[in-house]
Amino acid sequence: MENKTIVKTDIQIAQSADIRPIREIADKIAIEEEDLEYYGRHKAKIPLKYIDEEKIKKSKLILVTAINPTPAGEGKTTVSVGLCDGLNKIGKKAVLVLREPSLGPVFGSKGGAAGGGYAQVIPMADINLHFTGDFSAVEKANNLLSALIDNNLQSKKHNLNIDPKTIVWKRVMDMNDRALRQIVIGMGDKNGVVREEGFNITPASEVMAILCLSQDFEDLKQRLGNIFVGYTYDKKPVFARDLKAENAMAILLKDAIKPNLVQTLEGNPAILHGGPFANIAQGTNTIIATKMGLSLGDYVVTEAGFGGDLGAEKFIDIKCRYAGLKPDAYVIVATIRALRYHGGAKKDEYGSPNLEYLKKGFGNLCKHIENAQNYGFQPVVAINHFATDSEEEIKFLKDECAKLGVHAVLADEFMHGGEGMRDLAKIVVEATEQQSDFKFLYPLEESIEAKIEAVAKKIYGAEGVVYSPKAKADLKIIKDLGFDKLPVCIAKTQKSLSDDEKKIGRPTGFDVTVRGFEFAAGAGFVIPILGDIMRMPGLPEVPMAEGMTIDAEGNISGLS
């Protein structure tokens, strides 16, 4: 294996890559050139006609998740990219299927989100910025509904008698901007009804969740029409269909519903589509993109946001349930750095070797392994390799996983791309060939309380669930509206298995508290809210945007 020394930034590596015309990537997965909808030479949209339900049944779906992350993240996307490249290295026809990045985190605290090192999707700058305009389309569709709501409030002929104080629908923008969380609109003469309003970030929009859970265009329209807006003055529910909004919203999404084809640094096909967050929504790419990948490749590598307690749970209990899919392999990304953190290491300590911290933090990984087993999987652990990992620590982690009957394999994609992922790829292929006793955590027929309890006890490790008075009142409304047979999409912190971000490692003896409920009638899930969840993030003290530059030739630096 060639020993590469990383001296370049991610964007420098991406800019120096031998990027191929997208038609060559399409050829690898048998997409006809006349069917490609080009966005320049290196990006294209794929028509939905390439979804093949019979082929889907024969292909293997590999889900990549992670332990609870440190603030820096644990490289789940990087491992996913590397695993796809590794599978292709060992002769498998693998396709990568990921979410699209949000501009908010790109310019905020995270920077780019297209992988890292020698395991990236390209064109990296395009992907991290406007890409093919899908997020803009979601934003416009969301805000069209907002405009129709406010227009109806002052309509004299077609007024639905909506009580402005009950409107739950908010405008969105794909930027971190705390100043827009709570605003007042309609100020001034004849400018509309004055009311309180606010902005969410675009990935938090229900339109994004709907796009990602829709099976086709008709399903998309129906779900858009089912969006709950608020109540009339006589307490009747109002939906987007009552405002005749669904067709116009769908028109704005007519291209956004088509998946985007790009490539990895090694020239393997990557489909990027959709981008809901996993702490406040389902955190996975679109059903359409996943099915497209399974139709075009023999193996699909996909990821679910944050740790297994958030993205993976929602991937399985929401996305797979609606899509009729099930993963064939379950990969948990773990870093020794993060396990030191879960063992009590401080920010200035978890980047240095320390076996004692690792031993104390191993419980977090152990719980995520148990969670995979709750679904009937025997997971594979990918140890995302950092230069600060000691041989002693690596051996400890492999040995402890082996005691649980689980393969733990070093993932060296950051330094070596697909070549550094051959061993992991072989183990994952073996995992896809094993029979799993797959099962959901709960049946839909159960009560909302029983569903929450199933997730809280089986996945988080909680003793029980406590409901605030507001949560009890919200729950009655949900039951009265007939939405209690939907799956639950629990909104909580990604930093802990519990609902308290300070409880790192593997907390025990705790209850989780449901503070309130929201429901996404269009997307098709109920949202129990655990803790304080921010739907419009703010920028950090020193945002990533301040370190970015662009020269006279349009070359960008500082994007990652």
Question: What is the predicted function of each stretch?
Answer:
Residues 2-560:
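Flexible phosphate-sensing "switch/lid" loops adjacent to ATP/NTP-binding sites
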